[in-house]
Amino acid sequence: MAFGSKYMADIDKTLKYYNENAQSFASGTVSVKFTEVQDKFLEKLNPDAYILDFGCGAGRDTKYFLSRGYQVDAVDGSEQLCRIASEYTGIKVRQMLFQELDEKEKYDGIWACASILHLSKKQLREVWENMYAALKLEGWIYTSFKYGEFEGERNGRYFTDFTTDTFKDFIHDMHGLKIEEQWITGDVRPGRGEEKWLNLLLQKK
């Protein structure tokens, strides 16, 4: 999959941020209680479901899914976060870019929590098609984006924000994926509750 130099520069800058700040990022996320959303996703899956944690960060969600008995593949683009997540979860976390996902109908669920938001809309559209291909029929995707209409660099990373309406517009021609639930939450990290997030659950039909 080919992307222009501008897009790759944005990806490189975001990965550089996470590699340089991996330890502080991990410290700020692994202890955050996120079970309400995790369980909302798991309720959609069978007990023997195969999950892809797509952009696993420090491994908080992978560790929770494993503790609940699910089979999990965990990937991230940051070499340093992969190292931290491997140690934290006890499984091998694979370093890869979102654009490199090439599985076919392998997963019952794809968990993309605050991860694919670092892609531009152009990149996101192609990656979304790869996610769809990697998902089994009737499979589920959970994903989240910062709530808003901004797209560009912010705090050293690239972000694409969505509202409920702009995400519907973005996905309207992706036949076969249906938004089943969407809701807005505050940030669960201490001192950041005023930041709003768009949460989405979609099913492959």
Question: Residue locations for each model-derived region?
Answer:
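Conserved acidic residues
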Residues: 108
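A conserved beta-strand element that flanks and buttresses the S-adenosyl-L-methionine
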Residues: 111-112
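Hydrophobic adenine-recognition pocket in adenosine-nucleotide-binding enzymes
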Residues: 115
